[in-house]
């Protein structure tokens, strides 16, 4: 009793299409006449191909399961189907599929590309300042690209001319030729793999359906954009070949360093110089903010050099949000270098008072002891 197609491939009747393909590729590699000298290799290889040709199609597989092996073969014989003759799939195709499935490799198809080809994506580096990043801005950019031909409207054919299907390959773009055990597929020599013939190419774009041009485009930069943000503009890349879809334009944002602020996410940091009098007595001073103008910042009495004071919601805006970050001021107490006579007298008096207080409470000597203990 002859084996059924499932037995030939070594799988169960409930095997998935993926399991069928794996089994076929493994056996085809093993028994292909070009890879083995076994006497029964050609016969075995034909059986494997016949089995897979039936089972890989859901409709024919269902008919096979319903009729059974013998009845299905008889019906195929009467209908003239199932005759593979001396045809052998290209061993390179089998190896390509095998390594793609089992070795994790990528296979490059030998089939030519279609006439329509998608345009390439473009990248544009745009530098903005921090204020522009905070508020958001619309920028006009200029770049070289390919655009859809306005004479042939992307078809590649001279105005009024039609693009005809290649009669040599019937629009497939490839021709197949059998030589012994091998089937060779190559790009159609008549249409160069396009599948179509342009009898009268457009003079402006030379049959490509596009041409090079310097483009100007207005791009919207949203408020709160961060350094390194990439903004995609769909369809604004290079035009496709012969009516293919356009690629995309990616605008990469770089924010210039600021003279006052340093950015930390949505927070801003700045160095704030104050006099030692303000640090000691406290008070209010005006500080600039990123949105423009100034706000009052309260300096607590006794503020030390290096202290950090926070202005809430005075940092950067956030994309697609009403929430803002904070501004953190880092205090830098400035000591005057040039004193008037009166200022010196007052400071000398302050010095004496300070020494007496330290001596009376002993804190000065206690601090000194702690440094040496």
UniProtKB/Swiss-Prot annotation:
Cell compartments where the protein resides: Cytoplasm
UniProtKB keywords: Chaperone, Cytoplasm, DNA replication, Metal-binding, Repeat, Stress response, Zinc, Zinc-finger
Cellular component GO terms, alphabetical: cytoplasm
CXXCXGXG motif repeats: 149-156, 166-173, 188-195, 202-209
Zinc finger (CR-type): 136-214
Residues where Zn(2+) 2 binds: 166, 169, 188, 191
Cofactor(s) recorded in Swiss-Prot or TrEMBL: Zn(2+)
Record note on cofactor: Binds 2 Zn(2+) ions per monomer.
Predominant place of localization: cytoplasm
InterPro entries in the cross-refs: DnaJ, DnaJ_C, DnaJ_domain, DnaJ_domain_CS, HSP40/DnaJ_pept-bd, HSP_DnaJ_Cys-rich_dom, HSP_DnaJ_Cys-rich_dom_sf, J_dom_sf
Repeat keyword on record: yes
Domain J: 4-68
One GO MF term: ATP binding
GO biological process: chaperone cofactor-dependent protein refolding; DNA replication; protein refolding; response to heat
CDD domains the record matches: DnaJ (cd06257), DnaJ_C (cd10747), DnaJ_zf (cd10719)
Subunit structure, interactors included: Homodimer.
HAMAP family: DnaJ (MF_01152)
Comment, domains: The J domain is necessary and sufficient to stimulate DnaK ATPase activity. Zinc center 1 plays an important role in the autonomous, DnaK-independent chaperone activity of DnaJ. Zinc center 2 is essential for interaction with DnaK and for DnaJ activity.
Stated role: Participates actively in the response to hyperosmotic and heat shock by preventing the aggregation of stress-denatured proteins and by disaggregating proteins, also in an autonomous, DnaK-independent fashion. Unfolded proteins bind initially to DnaJ; upon interaction with the DnaJ-bound protein, DnaK hydrolyzes its bound ATP, resulting in the formation of a stable complex. GrpE releases ADP from DnaK; ATP binding to DnaK triggers the release of the substrate protein, thus completing the reaction cycle.
Protein name: Chaperone protein DnaJ
Organism the protein comes from: Rickettsia peacockii (strain Rustic)
UniProt lineage: Bacteria, Pseudomonadati, Pseudomonadota, Alphaproteobacteria, Rickettsiales
């Amino acid at each position: 009793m002859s084996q059924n197609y499932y037995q030939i491939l070594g799988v169960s009747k409930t095997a998935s299409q993926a399991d069928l393909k794996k089994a076929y590729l493994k056996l085809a590699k093993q028994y292909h006449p070009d890879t083995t000298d076994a006497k029964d290799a050609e016969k075995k290889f034909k059986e494997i191909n016949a089995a897979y040709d039936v089972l890989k199609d859901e409709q024919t597989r269902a008919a096979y399961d319903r009729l059974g092996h013998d009845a299905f073969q008889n019906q195929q014989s009467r209908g003239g189907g199932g005759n593979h003759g001396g045809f052998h799939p290209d061993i390179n195709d089998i190896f390509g599929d095998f390594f793609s499935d089992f070795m994790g490799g990528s296979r490059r198809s030998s089939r030519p590309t279609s006439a329509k080809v998608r345009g390439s994506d473009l990248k544009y580096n745009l530098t903005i300042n921090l204020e522009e990043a905070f508020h958001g801005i619309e920028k006009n950019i200029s770049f070289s690209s390919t655009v859809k031909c306005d004479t042939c409207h992307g078809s590649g054919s001279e105005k009024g001319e039609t693009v005809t299907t290649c009669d040599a390959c019937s629009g497939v773009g490839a021709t197949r030729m059998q030589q012994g055990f091998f089937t060779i597929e190559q790009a159609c020599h008549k249409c160069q793999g396009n599948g179509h013939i342009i009898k009268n190419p457009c003079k402006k774009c030379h049959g490509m359906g596009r041409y090079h041009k310097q483009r100007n485009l207005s791009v919207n930069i949203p408020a709160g954009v961060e350094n390194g943000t990439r903004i995609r503009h769909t369809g604004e890349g290079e035009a496709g070949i012969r009516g293919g879809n356009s690629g995309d334009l990616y605008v990469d944002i770089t924010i210039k360093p600021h003279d006052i602020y340093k950015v930390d996410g949505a927070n801003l940091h700045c160095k704030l110089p104050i006099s030692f009098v303000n640090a000691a007595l406290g008070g209010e001073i005006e500080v600039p903010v990123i949105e423009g103008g100034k706000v009052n910042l309260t300096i607590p009495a006794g503020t030390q050099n290096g202290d950090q004071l926070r202005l809430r919601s005075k940092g950067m805006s956030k994309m697609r949000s009403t929430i803002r970050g904070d501004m953190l001021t880092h205090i830098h107490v400035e000591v005057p270098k040039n004193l008037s006579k009166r200022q010196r007298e007052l400071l000398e008096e302050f010095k004496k008072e300070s020494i007496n207080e330290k001596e009376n409470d002993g804190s000065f000597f206690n601090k000194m002891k702690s440094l040496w203990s």
